[in-house]
Amino acid sequence: MLPLTLKELRGKVVLVHFYAFQCHNCHANFEIYRRWHEQWREKGVVVVGIQTPETSQERDPAAVKSAAAERKLEFPIMVDVASKNWDAWENTMWPTVYVVDKNGYLRQWWQGELNWKGATGDKSIEQGVAQLLAEP
């Protein structure tokens, strides 16, 4: 698959999530990202993972591909070896998910585990996505 750009995804709601496969907190969100992909892929929502490595193993595209397959993550994933995307988004922590509307504007984000200690980040993002899908 060729690299994706937000420009190519105009007209769709895009969920961009930054993570590292060896990040414990990131693991807690994988099931939610997988659910979102399955739930919304036919409705104009694209989930994109950006693996920003902390360790040498996380820099290896084959290891990233294997880890994604093991976790049944079937959405597009890129390896941000030089942290260029991390820096461009001014991201500060793993995991973080950004919600981009159909026009390419950042509308919502969540940093950390979506459901850490009773938080309802997944529900907040889901409500935001539903609202964006309802917009013309």
Go through each PLM region and give its residues.
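Structural microenvironment flanking redox-active thiols in thiol-disulfide oxidoreductases
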Residues: 27-71, 81-88
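Loop/turn elements at helix/coil->beta-strand transitions in domains of secreted/extracellular proteins
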Residues: 11-14, 43-46, 73-75, 102
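Active-site-proximal beta-strand/loop segments in catalytic clefts of secreted hydrolases
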Residues: 18-20, 50-53, 80-82, 110-113
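Thiol-/selenol-based redox modules, centered on thioredoxin-like
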Residues: 99-136
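Structural micro-motif
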Residues: 72-76, 90-98
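Short active-site neighborhood of thiol/selenol oxidoreductases, capturing the structured segment around
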Residues: 4-27, 47
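Short loop/turn elements that flank and shape the SAM/SAH-binding pocket of Class I
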Residues: 1-4, 83-85
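Surface-exposed alpha-helical interface segments used for non-catalytic interactions
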Residues: 31-34, 62, 95, 123, ...
